[in-house]
C-alpha cells in the first residue's frame, strides 16, 4: 500500500510504531542493563511502591510515578525490565502525538505527517530527552495531543476535554504545563491586539490546571525533593537562586554537579556548543520551513527564552537552560520538515517573508536531513569505546547530553560492578558505619542500599563528607567509586584510600 493512500487512522498507528521501534533499539542493545541517568531513580520509585508521601504531593508531577508504580505492582516485573518497555511506549506515544498535531492542527497530508513523526523519532535532541527524562517526555506527549484543542472557536465539549488534558499536563511535567499556559496566554494577547474574539473558553478550560500549578509553586517546587529516611545531605552545592526564586538561576554563581561555569565565556561556550550539537543541521531546514501559527510560535518563543535567557541575563535567568534547549526539538522539527517538504516539492525559495534572505537547494536540504538522522542513529546505538567514550559531542556538551545512549550514570560495563558493590556493603556495613555517596551513585543507593544503614550525600567534597561522618559519630565510612579514571567525572580518588572490595572497575573504599 502506498503511503499517500494510507488513511489517517492507519498513519497514526504507523507513527506510534515507528517511535516505539526506534526507542526499543537502544533498550535491546543494552539489555539487560538500564540506560539513562534518572532511570535508576524511576526504578527506585517503582521498587518503593509509594506514589504520594504527603498531602502536598497532589500538586506535584506525580502522574508518571503513579502509572509506573501501578504497572510494577500489577506485572511484578523487574523495575529495569518494566522501564525498558515503558520507555519505547512513551516515545511511540510522542511520535503519535507529533502525527496528531500535523494531522489535526496543520491539516498536513498523511505522508507529510508520517515524515515529521519519523524525522522527530531520529533526532538527537528527542532521543536525548527520552534517554532518561521520562516525566519530560510524558508531559510533552500529553501536550502534543492537547495542542489541536487550542482554537479560538472551541466549543463547550472541547472545553471539557481540554480541561481534563490540562490537568494531566500539569501532573505530568512543569515545562509542559508552562508551555500550555504560554500558548493560551499568547493567543489571548494576539486576540486583544488584533481585536479578535477573545478565547474565554480556553481560559476557563485551564483554570483547574492553573490552580494545581500554583499549588506546585507554593508547596512543592521551592523545597528540596524529600530524601530517604536513612539519608543525610552535606549540601556542598551552590544552587544560586536569585531572591530565593527556585525557577531562576544565577549562572555565574551556581555550582552543582550539573552546572558550574568559570566565566561568562564558559557559559556562552556551553550554550553555543549544545545548540550546535543538537540543531546545526536542523536550523537551516527550519528557516526554510518556518510558518506562522499563534500557539505554536509562542511555544517556540518560550522554549527559546528558556534556552538563551542565561546569555542575556546570566545573573537571573530561567533555570535548567539545557532542558529548555532539548525541548526546542518539538517546534523545530515541524519547521524543519515543512522546509524539507518545500525543498522536495521544488519550493525551496518559497519561504516566509521574515526569512526571505535564506536560500536552500535540494541537495543541501537532503544532506542536512540525512546528517541529522545519522547523528541520532549513532547516538542510540554506538557502544562506549573502552567503556569510556561515545562518538557524539565533546567536552562541554557531556553534562547535558551523553556521548551515547548506551550508558546510565555509569557505563554499561560497570553496572554489575556497581550492584556487586552495594550487595557487599549490605553484608559488611554495621550500625556504626556509613556510606559516603557522590551524586553519581545517589539513585543506586536509593535502589540497593539497605535502609538500616546511613548514607551521606555529597556533590563535590569527599573530605567534607568524611568530616560529617565523624561528626555524626560513625566509626567507619565507605565510598563507592571507580578504581581507575574513566574520564567522566571531576572527582579524583586520593591515593591513600583503601580498597576493601573490587568488582571490575568499581571498588568500595574505606575512607575512615
Ranges and model annotations:
Residues 1-398, 433, 437-438, 445, ...:
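Membrane-embedded transmembrane-helix bundle of lipid-linked glycan/lipid transferases
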Residues 375-462, 476-484, 509:
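Short periplasmic/luminal acceptor-recognition loop of GT-C membrane glycosyltransferases, typified by
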Residues 427, 469-472, 492:
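Structural motif
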Residues 449-455, 493-504:
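Structural alpha-beta junctions
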Residues 461-469:
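Alpha-helical scaffolding within the catalytic cores
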Residues 466, 485-486:
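Short, basic, helix/turn surface patches
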Residues 488-490:
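Extended non-globular interaction regions in eukaryotic gene-expression and organellar proteins
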